[in-house]
C-alpha cells in the first residue's frame, strides 16, 4: 500500500480503517495483529504521537513480519500492553512476555563440549561464517527517533572506543558522514567509490534510504549522516554504526568451527 502522508498520528477511527484490511490480508503482520483501537484511543495525545511513530511502518508496509519499532528504550514500558504481545508472539516460548533476558556467553554446553563443527554435517568446503550482536546506548534515542545532530553525536561518542579497538586489532573507521556540522570536518570520511567497494565486500551496509520499511520507521532518516563502520586490519571484526541498531558488532571468518567465531566476538 501507499505510504501514509505526514507524520501526524491518525485518529483511532482512521487507524482502524487502515489496519482492518491488513489484519485480514496479512495475518503474519504482528504490528497490525495486535493494534487495538480501544488501546490507541486511550493514549494521551503525546503518547499517541510517539506510538504512531512506533507502528507506522507496519501499516505502510503490510507485508512486514514485525512492523514496529520502539523509538526510545522507555517505549517498551510505556506501551507494554502492545509491545509485550508482539514480542511474546515472536518468542514463541514466552507468549506472555514475562521472562527477562540474561546474557550468557558460556557456550561450553552447546554442541560437543562447546565445539560446533560444521564439517560433521558433511560439508566439504569452508563456509563464510558470521556471528553478530546488536547494541543500543540508553543515553540516546533509538534509531527511529534520532535526528541528524544526535546521529552525529553518537558517531563522535564512539570514536574513543573505535580508537581503542584499532590499538588492539589495527584497522580503521570508515564513515560516510559528510561532516560533523558547524564547519567541523569528519577525519574518517570515505568517498563514494570506497563506500561501494566496502558494500561489495559485505563489510558495509547498503543505502538504508532505499529500504521502505526503515524509511517509514524513521530509521533511515538523515542518510548518510551518522553512518559507517569500524573494521579491524584483517577485516574479520566489524562494527556497523547508524544502521537498524545503533551498533551491530560482528566477527566474520572462513572455516567450519562456529564456536571459534563466537569466542572471538565474546
Task: Set out the residue ranges of the language-model regions.
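Long, Pro/Ser/Thr-rich low-complexity/intrinsically disordered regulatory tracts in eukaryotic proteins
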Residues: 2-266
Amino acid at each position: 500500500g501507499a505510504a501514509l502522508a505526514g507524520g501526524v498520528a491518525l485518529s483511532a477511527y482512521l487507524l482502524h480503517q487502515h489496519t482492518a484490511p491488513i489484519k485480514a490480508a496479512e495475518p503474519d503482520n504482528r504490528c497490525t495483529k495486535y493494534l487495538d483501537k480501544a488501546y490507541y484511543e486511550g493514549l494521551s495525545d503525546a503518547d499517541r504521537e510517539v506510538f504512531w511513530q512506533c507502528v507506522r511502518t507496519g501499516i505502510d508496509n503490510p507485508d512486514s513480519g514485525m512492523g514496529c519499532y520502539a523509538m526510545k528504550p522507555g517505549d517498551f514500558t510505556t506501551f507494554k500492553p502492545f509491545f509485550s504481545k508482539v514480542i511474546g508472539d515472536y518468542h514463541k516460548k514466552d507468549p506472555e512476555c514475562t521472562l527477562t533476558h540474561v546474557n550468557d556467553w558460556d557456550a561450553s554446553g552447546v554442541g560437543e563440549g562447546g565445539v560446533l563443527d560444521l564439517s560433521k554435517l558433511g560439508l566439504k568446503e569452508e563456509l563464510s561464517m558470521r556471528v553478530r550482536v546488536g547494541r543500543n546506548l540508553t543515553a540516546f534515542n533509538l534509531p527511529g527517533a534520532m535526528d541528524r545532530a544526535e546521529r552525529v553525536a553518537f558517531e563522535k561518542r564512539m570514536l574513543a572506543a573505535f580508537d581503542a579497538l584499532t590499538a588492539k586489532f589495527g584497522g580503521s573507521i570508515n564513515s560516510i558522514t559528510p561532516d560533523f556540522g558547524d564547519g567541523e570536518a569528519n577525519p574518517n570520511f570515505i568517498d563514494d567509490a570506497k563506500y561501494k567497494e566496502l558494500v561489495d565486500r559485505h563489510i558495509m551496509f547498503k543505502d538504508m534510504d532505499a529500504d521502505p520499511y526503515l524509511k517509514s520507521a524513521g530509521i533511515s532518516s538523515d542518510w548518510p549522516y551518522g553512518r559507517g563502520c569500524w573494521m579491524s586490519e584483517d577485516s574479520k571484526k566489524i562494527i556497523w554504526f547508524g544502521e537498524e541498531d545503533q551498533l551491530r558488532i560482528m566477527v566474520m571468518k572462513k572455516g567450519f568451527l562456529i564456536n571459534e567465531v563466537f569466542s572471538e566476538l565474546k
